[in-house]
Amino acid sequence: MVAQAVSAHARWSRAAQKTRTLDETLLPGARATLETTRGDFTVGRADLASLFEAEVALLQLERARIQSAVDTHLARVDLRAALGTDAPGGSP
C-alpha cells in the first residue's frame, strides 16, 4: 500500500508540474507565436503553411494540457485510494 501511495504521489506531482509548465510557459509562447505569424501572414511576411503550423502547434499543446489535467486528477484519485482518504492539500 505504501508503494502504491508513493507511486501515485509521484505521478500526481509530475502531472501537476507538466500542467503548470504548459499553462505558464508553453501555451503562452505558442499563442504569441500564432499571433505573430498571423500578423506576418496578413502583411505577406509569412506563408499559409507557417500559419497552419503555428495553429497546429497551439492545438497540440492545448490537447496536451487537457490530457495533463486528466492525468493529474487520475493520479490524485489513485493517491486517495492508496491512502484510504482524501489526498492532503489541493496540489502536490
Regions found by a protein language model. Give the residues of each.
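Amphipathic alpha-helical coiled-coil segments
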Residues: 1-64, 71-82
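Terminal intrinsically disordered/low-complexity segments used for targeting and assembly
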Residues: 80-92
